[in-house]
Amino acid sequence: MIDRCRSCLHLFNKHWVSEASGSIVVTETASDGASQAVFKTDKPCVIVKADKNAPLLWALAQRKCADGAFFLFDKDGAHLHIVELKSKIRLATWALTLNQFQGMFLTALAVARLLQVHELVRVTCYLAGTEDRITNESESASPTLLKAPVGMTKTFGGHESWDKGVVELPLSFKAALVKGWKARAPPRATILILA
């Protein structure tokens, strides 16, 4: 499958979509949360980098986008990994992050189609932060975000997805949520090893 993808990489600007192996680095450049998430793998990957002026796909209604994503290829097929880096994670931040995951998912899906990837084995969302302000609800944002609208089962802030560790994405996709905590001192990197 990776060979077919390689034959299509020329369709992309190498700054935004390229092949990677060994270490995959996703970087947050905003000064208040500047950090990196580093993934280690021996499998072939294609990385999708985000621009600070998201979205990468101009026609999307969802204008927000996560910091990066990558496709990991193994014998089963293509696995999509979506990565967002934050500093303090409050409920309001989490609601924004859900939108960023959705925007990057749709962008990555468009990239996948151009790479001749028509099916994803699994989608995983990663969120790395320095401080969890969601688990302790007294430290979180407005209580309004903890309430569900009348007749609905989901809260305004998406608290239930945080608790369950599942992110609902467009087109009926569901992704496992992996939470990581980065050090407060430089280089503030979260390192994950992928099999």
State the predicted function of each range.
Residues 1-61, 179-187, 193-195:
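Acidic-basic catalytic patches of nuclease active cores, encompassing PD-(D/E)XK
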Residues 63-66:
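Short, surface-exposed coil-to-beta transition loops
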Residues 68-70, 79-87, 104:
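Conserved catalytic cores of phosphodiester-cleaving nucleases, focusing on short active-site segments
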Residues 72-76, 130-132:
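Short, flexible beta-strand-to-coil junctions
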Residues 73-75, 109-118:
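Alpha-helix termini
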Residues 83-92, 117-121:
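Active-site nucleophile-His-acid catalytic modules used for acyl/amide transfer and hydrolysis
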Residues 88-108:
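Mg2+/Mn2+-dependent nuclease catalytic core
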Residues 116-195:
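Domain-level recognition of nuclease-like catalytic cores that cleave nucleotide substrates
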